[in-house]
């Protein structure tokens, strides 16, 4: 028994090391790749100081943090709702953040500061997450809870579309492109949003014990002495915060929170002590690679990263649905 535990521990360490190396390679490639390839030896040249340190580095850090936040949010929501298909984008949380953002633009008539827009996006994400939690407490079946989340997402998407369609504001029309997801406008001025993600990310990665209990189910968690009401509300607040900040920073990006936790679980990383940091590393790596594709796929324009992740993630999602139905 002890030997099996040690083997599993060594395997987990190997996975985390491999994911760390993958993330570092993706980060290095992201800093080098662009309209002009800049190798590490040229990073401190006048050209490198502009393109690498002022343009690519803030974007790369934002992509890394958002990818980690979305993947961890997916893992947390799957444990909270006891639903392997739970994910911020699929369950409407990202769209809720978008509704909060657009409502702020409409009510503020484009005069609100960036920090106020970010807080409104966070509030929208929290409201949708709390509604989903209310549905979960009614002990709905997995399929019905999933459908409820999809319906909330459709409602939020319809509200955003109506608002943008009837708006004469140029800023609001530009939000439609922004809601497809993209890091094109990220620079050091958004560093406060990046900093807002770090403490919540680190805190959630340290909460493996309650997450493992929640993954066992509500009855088992109660029997083990876990205060469900406290942890549910705290984790809902943390998830809503991460998704809201991510949407405020880069728009709606789907499938990262769904696919990454599933793939890691299929690889044997079921313990949240390993799954949560693994999700952070894998989510950051996946979104960095998707951002590189979005930047380089077309010579004349940049693809919305939400389109790239949806194109790559949709087939994986269909495969997961088919596998879950067997």
From Swiss-Prot:
Domain of life: Bacteria
Keyword list, A-Z: Cell inner membrane, Cell membrane, Membrane, Transmembrane, Transmembrane helix, Transport
GO biological process, one term: cobalamin transport
Transmembrane segments: 15-35, 61-81, 88-108, 112-132, 146-166, 184-204, 240-260, 274-294, 302-322
Pfam families according to UniProt: FecCD
Keyword presence, Metal-binding: no
Gene3D superfamilies per UniProt: ABC transporter involved in vitamin B12 uptake, BtuC
Molecular function per GO: vitamin transmembrane transporter activity
HAMAP family, alphabetized: BtuC
The protein, known as: Vitamin B12 import system permease protein BtuC
Gene (UniProt): btuC
């Amino acid at each position: 028994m002890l030997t099996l535990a040690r083997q599993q521990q060594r395997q987990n360490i190997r996975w985390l090391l491999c994911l760390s190396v993958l993330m570092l390679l993706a980060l290095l490639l992201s800093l080098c790749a662009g309209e002009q390839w800049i190798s590490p030896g040229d990073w401190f040249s006048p050209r490198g100081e502009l393109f690498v340190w002022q343009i690519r580095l803030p974007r790369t850090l934002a992509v890394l943090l958002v990818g980690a936040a979305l993947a961890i949010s997916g893992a947390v929501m799957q444990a909270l709702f006891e639903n392997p298909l739970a994910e911020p984008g699929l369950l409407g949380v990202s769209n809720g953040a978008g509704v909060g953002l657009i409502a702020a633009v409409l009510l503020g008539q484009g005069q609100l500061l960036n920090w106020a827009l970010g807080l409104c996006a966070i509030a929208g994400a929290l409201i949708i997450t709390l509604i989903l939690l209310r549905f979960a407490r009614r002990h709905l079946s997995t399929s019905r809870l999933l459908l409820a989340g999809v319906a909330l997402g459709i409602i939020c998407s319809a509200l955003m579309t109506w608002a943008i369609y009837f708006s004469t504001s140029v800023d609001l029309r530009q939000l439609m492109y922004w809601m497809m997801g993209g890091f094109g406008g990220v620079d050091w001025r958004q560093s406060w949003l990046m900093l807002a993600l770090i403490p919540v990310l680190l805190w959630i990665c340290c909460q493996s014990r309650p997450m493992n209990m929640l993954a066992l189910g509500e009855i088992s968690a109660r029997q083990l002495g876990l205060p469900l009401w406290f942890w549910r509300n705290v984790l809902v607040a943390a998830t809503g915060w991460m998704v809201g900040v991510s949407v405020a920073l880069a728009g709606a990006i789907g499938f990262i929170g769904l696919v990454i936790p599933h793939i890691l679980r299929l690889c044997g990383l079921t313990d949240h002590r390993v799954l949560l940091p693994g999700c952070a590393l894998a989510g950051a790596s996946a979104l960095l690679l998707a951002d590189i594709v979005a930047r380089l796929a077309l010579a004349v324009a940049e693809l919305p990263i939400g389109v790239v992740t949806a194109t790559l993630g949709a087939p994986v999602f269909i495969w997961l649905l088919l596998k879950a139905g067997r």
